[in-house]
């Protein structure tokens, strides 16, 4: 799982948060915790083994929710080793139109392009 240190415990409350051991093995995963144990945010970037992917059927057969990939991760890390990869540099949450517009305008400024007033992919 790719993670990013958001650097702020209040901001961490908005995300799925992971805790890791000294080898970056995931020891805990909590979705939008009231009191985050760390500032390592799950970025919804996952790499699964074939064995992990095969566990999806078991996960669903147990009546777990089929949406939100974080639910599967929270379940899986207690059954199989999962590790965190810490993204260096910048990461942008583009979960809604306003966040996407902000990230897009930041990139546009870097390239000397005019900012957009609203997001339109064209």
What are these regions (language model features)?
Residues 1-17:
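Short beta-strand-to-loop element that shapes/binds the nucleotide-sugar donor at the catalytic cleft/hinge
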Residues 10, 22-121:
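Catalytic-core segments of class I nucleotidyltransferases/pyrophosphorylases
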């Amino acid at each position: 799982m790719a993670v990013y240190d958001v650097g702020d415990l209040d901001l961490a409350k908005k995300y799925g948060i992971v805790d890791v051991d000294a080898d970056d093995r995931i020891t805990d995963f909590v979705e939008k915790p009231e009191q985050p144990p760390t500032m390592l945010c799950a970025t919804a970037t996952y790499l699964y083994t074939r064995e992990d992917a095969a566990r999806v059927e078991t996960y669903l057969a147990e009546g777990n929710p089929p949406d939100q990939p974080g639910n599967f991760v929270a379940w899986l890390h207690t059954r199989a080793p999962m590790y965190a990869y810490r993204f260096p540099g910048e990461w942008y949450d583009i979960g809604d139109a306003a966040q996407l517009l902000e990230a897009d305008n930041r990139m546009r400024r870097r390239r000397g392009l005019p900012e957009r007033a609203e997001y339109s992919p064209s």
